[in-house]
Amino acid sequence: LKPLIDYVVPRMKDVGITEGRVLMARDPQQMMSYLRRGKVDWVTETPGTGLLLADRAGARPLLLTERSGSREYRSVIFTHRDSGITDLSQLLGKTIAFQSPSSTSAYLVPALALRERRLPMGLMVSPLEGREPGSVGYVFANTDANLAAWVHKRLVDAGGFSDQDWDQLQRVSEAFRRDLVVIHTTDPVPRAMELVSGNMAPAVEARLKEVLLGASTDPQARDALRQFFRTTGFYEADPASQAQLEKLRRGAREIREALE
């Protein structure tokens, strides 16, 4: 993160910014605290957590972020090829693994797909916990590698994460490529977003936006962007991406109210 800070700060002297530092948060709750107490000015996040920070800590969306050339991604829900499961409706009475409660593509988006099918869901502490016949049991695997392995070993019946993680899985494991199959692909959501504190001065916000929008065409920013989660550019939300974000915002609220 620091190389991009070092690129941005010298270009903001005209609005009074002369230094910057990186402050890491262990989870979204700590980042909310930082924002409310004025300890953080600029946050980069996946859209699910970014919208949560906007709703609960007053953060303002600034720009959307292109990473590794991708402006959006989807979630996939997959099963073992021998499971006999070919449709989301067949997950009733079964189990699904997600990555973590803060993940957009490996929790919020696939969970929303299940909710849209009106499938009741119940949290499990462990994949070995007994299944409830009238709901979809869900459990957090903590890492994408665990998630895929649990489905492959039949510890759970299904898993959900991003299409980019799925593509990576297909490249690195012949066994996973042979034995796992996607049964559902969601609509796309923006890949990532930049947010600023609700207390940021308008002139500072405008200058930060200007600097970030120009970074992808500035050779001096190339290495800093690469180290910033392989960012390849920043862009303003258009009507289509705004609609995607609003749908995700409503869905995330529903998921949190119903499941958390």
Name the predicted role of every residue range.
Residues T44-A57, P110-E116, A149-R177:
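A ligand-binding cleft/hinge motif common to bilobed small-molecule-binding domains
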Residues R60-S70, S126, Q170-P188:
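Short beta-strand->loop
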Residues R36-E45, K94-I96, S135, T143-L147, ...:
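Alpha-to-beta junction loops
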Residues L1-L51:
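Extracytoplasmic small-molecule ligand-binding "clamshell" domains
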Residues R74-I85, V189-V204:
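A bilobed periplasmic-binding-protein/Venus flytrap-type ligand-binding module shared by bacterial periplasmic
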Residues S33-Q90, P101-S102, P110-E116:
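Acidic, polar ligand-binding/catalytic clefts
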Residues L1-R11, Y73-A148, D223:
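Bilobed "Venus flytrap"/periplasmic-binding protein-like clamshell domains
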Residues L1-Y7, L195-E260:
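An extracytoplasmic/periplasmic, membrane-proximal ligand-sensing/linker region
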